[in-house]
Amino acid sequence: THLFQPSLVLDMAKVLLDN
């Protein structure tokens, strides 16, 4: 099972915002 990790989402959102 693939658990959803908030840290991963925050990191991706951070990259999107930085871009």
Swiss-Prot record:
Stated role: IRBP shuttles 11-cis and all trans retinoids between the retinol isomerase in the pigment epithelium and the visual pigments in the photoreceptor cells of the retina.
GO molecular function, one term: retinal binding
Record-annotated membrane-spanning stretches: none
Chief location: secreted
GO CC terms of this entry: extracellular region; interphotoreceptor matrix
Cell location: Secreted, Extracellular space, Extracellular matrix, Interphotoreceptor matrix
Keywords in alphabetical order: Extracellular matrix, Secreted, Transport, Vitamin A
Source organism: Cavia porcellus (Guinea pig)
Protein name: Retinol-binding protein 3
